[in-house]
Design a protein with these regions (language model features):
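Divalent metal-coordination and catalytic microenvironments
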Residues: 6, 41, 62, 96, ...
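C-terminal structural cap/anchor segments
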Residues: 41-87, 91
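Short acidic/histidine-rich active-site segments
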Residues: 38-42, 86-108
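Divalent metal-binding pocket/active-site signature
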Residues: 1-49
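Mid-to-C-terminal alpha-helical segments outside catalytic/metal-binding sites
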Residues: 88-89, 105-151
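Hydrophobic alpha-helix feature that most strongly marks membrane-spanning transmembrane helices
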Residues: 30-33, 55-58, 83-87, 99, ...
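Short, well-ordered coil/turn segments that N-cap beta-strands
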Residues: 1, 33-36, 58-61, 87-91, ...
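Histidine/acidic-residue-rich catalytic or RNA/ligand-binding cores of hydrolases
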Residues: 13-22, 47-56, 72-80, 100-116
Length: 151
């Protein structure tokens, strides 16, 4: 069974921002290498630390939830950085919402940001349009389905 962990300022951290630092999970990942972990919210403001953990540990995946609602520009920046550092099969979109309306709105924002970032990469000839579609589908569907055993 996978373990979901809220990180960053959305971790309900009793107003102590440092409680959301994913570096505190490093020993947990070392101790349980066969456990699958998914970390939420890109750990803002500890995104660099999060990306380092996701790159190092094969059992750590990331969920992009809530990032677009915090800041569209920040979401674009960090998604671009993610693609520079980490294989896209380690990223999924989960929403982390309480209502259908909230989930729908959040997903619309996520799709817009993913499309914008991938379009820029196609324009810059970093990837072709077919690869962009493959990446978007993986993030929005396939990666979570694989991770949670839905298919």
């Amino acid at each position: 069974m996978p373990v979901q962990i809220h990180t960053g300022i959305f971790a309900r951290n009793s107003s102590l921002i440092s409680n959301g630092n994913p570096e505190q999970l490093n020993n947990l990942f070392l101790e349980y290498p066969d456990t699958r972990f998914v970390l939420f919210h890109f750990s803002y403001p500890y995104t660099s630390q999060l990306f380092s953990l996701a790159k190092i540990f094969p059992n750590v995946k990331l969920d992009f939830c809530w990032v677009p609602m915090l800041s569209m520009n920040m979401a674009k920046k960090y998604l671009n950085e993610f693609f520079d550092l980490i294989p896209y099969n380690k990223l999924m979109w989960g929403g982390d919402s309480y209502t259908v309306e909230e989930a729908y709105g959040a997903t619309c924002l996520a799709r817009e940001i993913i499309a914008w970032v991938l379009t820029e990469r196609v324009k810059n000839k970093e990837i072709n349009s077919e690869k962009a579609i493959q990446i978007a589908y993986a993030i929005l569907n396939q990666n979570a389905s694989n991770f949670y055993g839905l298919i």
